[in-house]
Amino acid sequence: AGMCDHINSCGYHYTPKEYFRDNPAVKERLNGQERFGGTPIAARPPARALPEQKPRISFLPSDWVEQSMRRYDINPLYRYFTKVMGKENVDKLFSLYRVGTSKMWGGATVFWQTDRDGNVRAGKIMGYDAESGHRVKEPFNQVNWVHSVRKMPDFRMKQCFFGEHLLSDTSSTISSNPVAIVESEKTALIAAHFIPDFTWLATGGTHGCFNREAIQVLEGREVILFPDLKATDEWRQRLPMLESVCRRTTCSDLLERIATDEQRSQGLDIADFLLMEDTPQMILARMIECNPVLQTFIDTFGLELVDAGQE
């Protein structure tokens, strides 16, 4: 209230009396403060609550994935897999799941986590033994993350399923497949080879990305869980959470029913059972190891291993 800033041009004067007449609520507030000994203050409009913002998710450059998908000759897990299922099949799997090779530990495996929208959420680097295919845990556990190795400041990692990018495939073959979820990335790859009628995903650990937010990508899908031995009860407790999103959910107890006490104590998973019987590729690899000339013979005549189970 008071004189207009442009009084010299308009001559208008808005008096305090007129202001309080037009704004009785302000007058009442000031009078109340004076009655209780308060100092009159100018009325302020109520503060607006700021909308809650979700923490920003960091992504890795997609070209890092492409750059890593080479030098498989030094990748111990790749070399192990070629003995299990053959080079051609491994090449297809590593391309489908976008598995890479790192310079760390002489060629460690990089399991890239790419979400359904094509964003690269994370890259897990893990060391494997080329002979056994097992993780290297001695003299230290060979596991790291790409963003840590690259020293990316303020990187906010939010994991997704390993293999989640396959859910964006709208082809009739992939989109109609039931989704099978296991714990480890290596298990997902092995199962994808032997049981291709499922789309195999991995949580990346007992808990990993197994949470309410991450499972939203499974909306409307038929999902079956294949937990490691000893984790069946814990994973079965996740069913109500999945049932609120998925069209149908099941937690397989197949391994629990067929496992021995020793196997159960070892916490084996479905991949361990799939590899219990030697594949033709594994038998051939042992034959070549005993007689390297056999590989030269195969290469010279372009021989291929025929699956006896195929007609």
Predicted segments, located by residue:
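Non-catalytic accessory segments of DNA primases and related replication-initiation nucleases
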Residues: 1-108, 130-150, 220, 230-231, ...
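TOPRIM fold recognition
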Residues: 3, 13, 116, 176-179, ...
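Intrinsically disordered, low-complexity segments enriched in small/polar residues
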Residues: 9, 30, 35-36, 84, ...
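Surface-exposed flexible segments
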Residues: 14-25, 121-128, 194-195, 240
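Intrinsic-disorder-associated interaction segments
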Residues: 58, 70, 150-155, 263, ...
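Short, exposed beta-strand "edge-strand" segments with a Pro/Gly-rich flavor and a Y/T-containing core
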Residues: 82-83, 152-169, 258-268, 272
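Phosphate-handling DNA/RNA-contact segment within nucleic-acid enzymes
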Residues: 110-219
